[in-house]
């Protein structure tokens, strides 16, 4: 049995279509979807329809699915969330609401567990591999897969929390996303798989539609990481023609920077905006439209030098 594992699509329909086509061309029998399907790219509604139509698929919900129910506000910070939720039909929202936070099943004697975040299984053991930290560890260039996987394994090896959690976990496969970086590691009878982010890969490598294939045969598991390069600038040009770009320009521009660099930008922009708001005595949170946009102009101008 071969599973295509896809996570963190974030409304990026072109990336999802590339991943699905590649998975089917490589003989995928079923799909495992690990959450965060909408918001950040403008095609969340089409993404949901595509996911609902997938044959032999299991889905869990991510943290972004919770934000879709935020009351519509007049702030700048959540403009993209408000816009994204308005694009979804009632039946799509209901489908997302019904998704479980965690699933498990057995295949050929192997127990497979899936949740959106690794915290469901190993606590904060992988926290040092969060996107903002990766951007600091690998500030420029493309990190090789060999180096990235070795660094990830070293982080887990050196984590007391990880080894404590490992003692409590039943043997099997553990699948999760959320951190937007693709990796897998085997520790004895435990196999951990993060398929990365299909829609916004932040693992300091090439821009690509990212997902992972898991094959289970006669109780044995093999993993193949898949990365399908495509044109970031062409995608950006397409997004600029959508309503989202005008409704949530600042957030969308930051996503463009993430696509161009394959590194976290949102975290650093939010830190910048917090400092900017404090400097002008603005205590409103979420940030107002005026503060949000002025902070972005300052951020953009600073990045030019």
What label would you give each PLM region?
Residues 1-4, 104-113, 187-192, 221-222:
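Beta-strand-turn-beta hairpins that frame and shape the catalytic cleft
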Residues 186-305:
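Acidic, His/Gly-rich catalytic cores of divalent-metal-dependent hydrolytic chemistry
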Residues 23-27, 107, 167-170, 213, ...:
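Glycine-rich phosphate-binding loop signature in dinucleotide/nucleotide-binding domains
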Residues 10-14, 39-42, 64-69, 120-122, ...:
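Active-site environment of divalent metal-dependent phosphoester hydrolases
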């Amino acid at each position: 049995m071969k599973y295509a594992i896809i996570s963190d699509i974030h409304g990026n329909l072109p990336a999802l279509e590339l991943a699905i086509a590649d998975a089917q061309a490589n003989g995928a029998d079923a799909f495992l979807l690990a959450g965060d399907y909408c918001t950040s790219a403008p095609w969340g509604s089409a993404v949901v329809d595509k996911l609902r139509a997938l044959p032999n698929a299991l889905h869990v919900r991510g943290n972004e699915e919770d934000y879709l129910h935020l009351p519509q506000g007049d702030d700048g910070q959540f403009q993209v969330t408000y816009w994204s939720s308005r694009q979804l039909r009632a039946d799509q929202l209901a489908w997302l609401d019904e998704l479980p936070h965690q699933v498990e099943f057995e295949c050929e004697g192997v127990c497979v567990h899936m949740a959106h975040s690794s915290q469901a299984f190993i606590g904060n053991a992988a926290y040092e591999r969060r996107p903002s930290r990766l951007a600091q560890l690998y500030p420029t260039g493309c990190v090789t897969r060999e180096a990235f996987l070795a660094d990830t394994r070293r982080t887990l090896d050196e984590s007391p929390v990880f080894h404590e959690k490992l003692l409590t976990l039943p043997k099997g496969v553990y699948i999760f996303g959320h951190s937007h970086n693709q990796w897998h590691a085997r520790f004895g009878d435990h196999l951990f798989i993060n398929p990365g982010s299909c829609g916004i890969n932040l693992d300091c490598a090439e821009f690509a539609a990212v997902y992972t294939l898991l094959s289970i045969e006669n109780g044995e598991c093999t993993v193949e990481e898949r990365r399908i390069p495509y044109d970031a600038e062409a995608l950006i040009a397409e997004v600029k023609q959508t309503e989202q770009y005008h409704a949530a320009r600042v957030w969308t521009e930051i996503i463009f920077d993430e696509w161009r660099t394959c590194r976290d930008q949102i975290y650093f922009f939010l830190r910048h905006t917090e400092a900017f708001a404090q400097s002008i005595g603005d205590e409103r949170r979420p940030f107002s439209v005026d503060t949000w946009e002025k902070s972005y102009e300052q951020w953009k101008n600073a990045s030019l030098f």
